[in-house]
Amino acid sequence: MVPNLDLETAIQIISSLETQLSELEGATKEYENDLEQVISKLKSDLLESQQQNKCNKKQITDLEIQVDELENENIQLRNKIETLQLESDRRLERNVLLEHELLDTKEALQKLRVSKEEATSGETRRNTRSLPSQNKKMKLFKDTIKVSTTSSTLYLQNMAKTNNAARSHCNIPNTQITQSTVIATTSSV
């Protein structure tokens, strides 16, 4: 049951309610505007975040491609290093073998020289030749030799620049070494 109100009180209540309604409508519009601004800001942030996400995905894809390329390049470089290391080891081993062959050849040459000196000194005693001609023979005999190699052979060649008669007294036959023994080997880790 509604209490009895006089007209003036009812008008005041209606006026007060209209004022409250007007204030509520203003507040509602203000909240709606604020809410629209928040929604608009969130949409803008979402779009920006999506764009940033796309950029990040593209960067990640690019970085993964670069990582794959670098890994492939790294594998190729490691293979090249292993190949070069093996080649270096083979060359070092070959050099060691050639050095030993050269030392053996020098020893053989020295033995030939000693034998030649002994033969020449014995011949000198028999022929009573003068000492200067003996020294000349020794000088001719000590001329340089040429050392050359192929893939598996070491060659020695007399390089004396003398006439055939003199060369026959100090002849070092062209020597060829085709067999050797492996003394040391190298291996890659």
UniProtKB/Swiss-Prot annotation:
Residues 114-139 are annotated as: Disordered. Residues 4-121 form a coiled coil. One of its GO terms (biological process) is nuclear migration along microtubule. Residues 114-126 have a biased composition (Basic and acidic residues). The keyword Ribonucleoprotein does not apply. Required for nuclear migration to the bud neck during cell division. Targets cytoplasmic dynein to microtubule plus ends thereby promoting dynein-mediated microtubule sliding along the bud cortex and consequently the movement of the mitotic spindle to the bud neck. It is found in: Nucleus; Cytoplasm, Cytoskeleton. It comes from Saccharomyces cerevisiae (strain ATCC 204508 / S288c). The keyword Cytoplasm applies. This is Nuclear distribution protein nudE homolog 1. Self-associates. Interacts with PAC1. Gene3D superfamilies: 6.10.250.1080. Keywords: Cell cycle, Cell division, Coiled coil, Cytoplasm, Cytoskeleton, Microtubule, Mitosis, Nucleus, Transport. It comes from the Eukaryota. Belongs to the nudE family.
